[in-house]
Amino acid sequence: MTSIRRLIAIAITPALFMATSCGRHSTSEVFYLIAANLSLPYWKTAETGFNAAAARYRVTGKVAGPDNYDPQAELQELNHAVAAKPAGILISVADEGLLKPGIDAAIAAGIPVITIDSDAPSSRRLFFIGTNNLDAGHLGGERIAERLGGRGNVVFYSMPGQPNLDERLQGYKDIFATHPDIKIIDVVNIKGDARNAFDNTQQYLAQTGVARVSAFICLEASSGKVVADAVRRQKITDRVVVAMDVDQDTLAEIKDGTIEATISQKPFTMGYVGLKQLDEIFHNMPKSLSKDYSVDAFAEYPVFIDTGTALVDKANVDVYARSAADHQ
């Protein structure tokens, strides 16, 4: 099922209008945030940031995309958005090969496009806002290597082909390359359904001897809590689980000790800064949107805005839990 939400900016008084220096803005300026898996808490947080920026700038924000992991449905929403000729599009790319033509079509139509969360560097998008996913993988890989003492079998849960997840996997591989006794025995494609992670974890927990799995690594947000649940149900306490993102369930599993650590991202910031950047571009359009600004040393646009990552474990989980509670 596809969901679409709309924020209409509230009219302001002339005095406030002048005080906020927003005279150039209008609710007729429509910006889109497009992503797959909108039902995830991660995207609820990104939407909150996007809408907060829309409210601040007195513009209209629309959030569109499938509630589940469906790149084809995301493409349909992108095509609908391009046809509507909005002021700008912010998009998380579930499948670069599939979505690249739509992104390029938007740019060709004079619509600024910025990617967030998951990039499409081969497209004509202007730049990327989000996590340094290689660094995220390095953080997790270092913790796994430390906890395993440099030896053991590991299983990943991912959705191969999604650019940000592939980059995180590469980050882990970079670290494991210096620990040759850490073996990756599987990268499970959960296909957008965390239940696949649960089922596979149960099967891998039954393996013993040289096939024993010592660690489970979740490269996306939904798998962590179900992997932890599978481990808990079998009353196993000697396996390492590393998750992704800081939803309440994941933080609770860290407090419980079932999840060793998670890698935090800043989806609110991605949504907020994304709309802010689109607004600036819309009101100061370059001579050419299709130019490759990444190779221009004098470009007014960055290649990448890093919104930050951090490793969250028992030592700092309460800080993240309080922050989440403050923003509910």
Predicted features by range, described:
Residues 97-135, 142-147, 153, 247-255, ...:
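Flexible loop/hinge segments that line or gate small-molecule binding clefts
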Residues 22-25:
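Bacterial signal peptide processing site
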Residues 55-68, 153-158, 173-194:
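Short beta-strand elements in bilobed, periplasmic/extracellular small-molecule ligand-binding domains
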Residues 74, 129-154, 166-167, 195-198, ...:
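Hydrophobic alpha-helical segments within soluble ligand-binding/sensing domains
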Residues 90-107, 172, 186, 191-253:
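Hydrophobic alpha-helical
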Residues 42-57, 136-140, 164-183, 196, ...:
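Short, solvent-exposed amphipathic alpha-helices that sit
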Residues 175-176, 275-328:
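Hinge/cleft segment of the Venus flytrap/periplasmic-binding protein
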Residues 30-57, 61-80, 84, 92-96, ...:
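Extracytoplasmic "Venus flytrap"
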